[in-house]
A protein has these predicted regions:
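Sec-exported extracytoplasmic/periplasmic mature domains
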Residues: 31-38, 58-63, 80-84, 98, ...
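A ligand-binding cleft/hinge motif common to bilobed small-molecule-binding domains
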Residues: 99-102, 237-257
Length: 365
């Protein structure tokens, strides 16, 4: 008993309390997690996130965190295979839209709300739009969507070849002037190109996309290749490559600039902003500790800075992201506009994103 009390006191001294009203409960979770001494999380394929998250979490809690950085489908498929085989390795997963829905539907995830130990995390008033679920049709409890942004992977132009006033509407992209001069991130695979393509599919229809394809688009899954072509004036306009791809060219003074949003708007996204806890995690207290830290104000500030993404937390500043070509939905959109422009979350993913991607498969050969 004395050892447990000593451990709780040590955790209280070691861990800065995330919420002053509940130090005892959170300290118990942290103490139990420290006894497990490990948590395993599947994360997006970002070397920066893996390196900085390892240092931040281990440095704060003194607990080893194994981070498996890989494309979302790779981690999700591995979890599904292991769950079916009775293997318990992963504790939690962070992915983009749609990726983990089969896990939710297959009973392979834990409900999120019972694991929200911190009041600042549980309280929907701290979140723009309240609690938003990726699995928002039937279950509404397994996958929490903590990012909402607009503009990521948007529209860029070469300022020696195009002018913003020539591209005020999506219809302007059908001008014969741009034939053979536009690049698109491949909409047949998940990503920013698919998001833009899906918005066009929903707002403008399939005839519009047929005409767009007739513009002899340069379609690639290599965003760096698309950005390089724009910087070298091989393309005049690109769709789907983002600020991170263009930053080196901007710093070199090359003529690449982001287009203002067309009058129809740009798609709202939750980026790599969906978190779930795996069913019967091997380190249940570590999983709960990680979830609460990630969704806390501190965790959301950390994740946003590393990933250049926009949290939905109302107490975290996101206006600085405009310099990186991203705008937080909470800073720029009403909830009605957000729901009009988004093609993520299960309802839009199944009725817009998937059929739009299937149409892309048909007409992009």
């Amino acid at each position: 008993v004395r050892q447990v009390v000593t451990l709780v006191i040590a955790i209280l001294l070691f861990v800065p309390v995330l919420h002053a009203a509940e130090p005892a409960d959170f300290a118990k979770i942290a103490a139990a997690a420290k006894q497990e001494n490990k948590v395993v999380v599947g994360i997006p394929p970002s070397a920066d996130l893996r390196k900085q998250l390892d240092a931040a979490f281990k440095g704060k809690f003194g607990i080893d965190i194994e981070l498996l950085a890989a494309p979302g489908p790779q981690n999700a498929n591995r979890i599904a295979s292991e769950q079916k085989a009775g293997v318990r390795y992963f504790d939690a997963i962070i992915v983009g839209t749609g990726t983990a829905l089969p896990l939710a539907h297959g009973g392979m995830l834990e409900p999120i709300e019972p694991n929200m130990a911190l009041a600042e995390v549980r309280d929907p008033k701290n979140w723009w739009g309240g609690h938003i679920w990726e699995d928002n049709l039937k279950t509404k409890r397994f996958l929490y969507s903590f990012i909402a942004e607009v503009g990521t992977g948007g529209l860029w132009y070469n300022s020696t070849l195009a002018k913003p006033e020539e591209l005020r509407s999506l219809d302007d992209f059908l001008n014969p002037k741009w034939k053979g001069k536009m690049g698109l991130s491949d909409p047949r695979v998940p990503g920013s190109g698919q998001s833009l393509w899906s918005l066009c599919w929903e707002l403008k229809g399939e005839d519009y996309l047929r005409k767009l394809v007739q513009q002899n688009l340069f379609v690639s899954r290599d965003l760096r290749q698309i950005a390089d072509a724009l910087a070298k004036s091989k393309l005049a306009i690109t769709m789907g490559a983002g600020h991170s791809q263009y930053e080196p060219f901007i710093n070199s003074g090359l003529p690449v600039k982001q287009l203002p949003a067309p009058k129809e708007g740009l798609p709202a996204s939750n980026g790599y902003g969906v978190v779930g806890i795996v069913k019967n995690p091997p380190h249940p207290n570590g999983a709960k500790l990680f979830l609460n830290w990630l969704l806390s104000r501190e965790g959301q500030e950390f994740y946003g800075k590393v990933m250049k993404s926009s949290t939905r937390r109302l107490d975290v500043d996101t206006k600085w992201l405009i310099a990186y070509g991203t705008q937080a939905a909470k800073d720029t959109l009403t909830l009605d506009d957000y729901n009009r422009l988004r093609n993520h979350l299960e309802d839009k993913y199944t009725t817009v994103r998937l059929p739009a991607a299937e149409f892309a498969e048909q007409i992009l050969k």
